[in-house]
Swiss-Prot record:
Keywords: Methyltransferase, S-adenosyl-L-methionine, Transferase, Ubiquinone biosynthesis. The keyword Transferase applies. This is Ubiquinone biosynthesis O-methyltransferase. GO terms for molecular function: 2-polyprenyl-6-hydroxyphenol methylase activity; 3-demethylubiquinol 3-O-methyltransferase activity; polyprenyldihydroxybenzoate methyltransferase activity. It catalyses: a 3-demethylubiquinol + S-adenosyl-L-methionine = a ubiquinol + S-adenosyl-L-homocysteine + H(+); a 3-(all-trans-polyprenyl)benzene-1,2-diol + S-adenosyl-L-methionine = a 2-methoxy-6-(all-trans-polyprenyl)phenol + S-adenosyl-L-homocysteine + H(+). One of its GO terms (biological process) is methylation. O-methyltransferase that catalyzes the 2 O-methylation steps in the ubiquinone biosynthetic pathway. It comes from Rickettsia canadensis (strain McKiel).
Length: 236
């Protein structure tokens, strides 16, 4: 069962050349990227005593906004995306900046099922896929025993519709119009149900909010709009 939403792919295909333009279609991701990286690295270093040989998988990597900086810091990163044009953009940027990383054009379904990783990352992806439950199950099956995963997405709440779609897309123009579909947003409780009997435990939920007074993004306990989900797999 494929997780590919062809309409979503077509949408991102048109702007796949623009990933590293901080003033372009993905400008908002550049704004939140330092916080995303800081959160991911904090979770990795808190969970593992020795990070020198860790293998990281970034699913739906886009142009490599997370994968390339992680690899630049010495992590062993494999990053996959369904769009070949995204992989070409990511590969070119990494090469230009002397970063060693393994970029692959692949869906999570096409990835070898017996290959496990210490860390699995999937940021701002699950709200763009079909068959989301199967996608998430395929995602977590690649986590090693005692491994971790970090997912980020948007909550399906009224506030998320107002801020994530009306304000972000139509008023402020932070992202292109029609980037998001409210019906595809997921509540944490829904992901929790999908993970039942998988041996995966949700250890933390952390919100990401925009502080208008300070004109900055920051982590928060408010998960009404954007949120991170930190997962751990048991040792069995």
């Amino acid at each position: 069962m494929s997780s590919i939403d062809k309409k979503e792919l077509e949408k991102f295909e048109k702007i796949s050349h623009n990933w590293w333009n901080k003033d372009g279609d993905f400008g908002i991701l550049h704004c939140i990227n330092p916080i995303r990286l800081e959160y991911i690295i904090e979770k990795i270093t808190s969970h593992y005593n020795d990070i020198s040989k860790l293998e990281i998988l970034d699913v739906g990597c886009g142009g490599g906004l997370i994968a390339t900086p992680l690899a630049a810091q010495g992590f062993n990163v494999t990053a996959i995306d369904a769009l070949q044009s995204n992989i070409e953009t990511a590969t070119a940027y990494a090469k230009e900046n002397g970063v060693k990383i393994n970029y692959l054009q692949s869906t999570i379904e096409e990835l070898k099922s017996n290959k496990l990783y210490d860390v699995v990352i999937c940021l701002e992806v699950i709200e763009h896929v079909e068959n989301v439950q199967q996608f998430i199950l395929n995602l977590v099956q690649h986590i090693k025993p005692n491994g971790i995963a970090i997912i980020s997405t948007i909550n399906r709440m009224k506030k998320a519709y107002i801020l994530g779609i009306i304000v972000a897309e139509y008023i402020l123009g932070w992202v292109p119009k029609n980037t998001h579909n409210y019906s595809k947003f997921l509540k944490p409780s829904e992901i929790y149900e999908m993970l039942t009997d998988t041996g995966i435990e949700i250890k933390e939920l952390k919100g990401l909010i925009y502080d208008m007074a300070k004109n900055e993004w920051k982590l928060s306990d408010n998960i009404e709009v954007n949120y991170f989900m930190y997962l751990e797999r048991n040792t069995h």
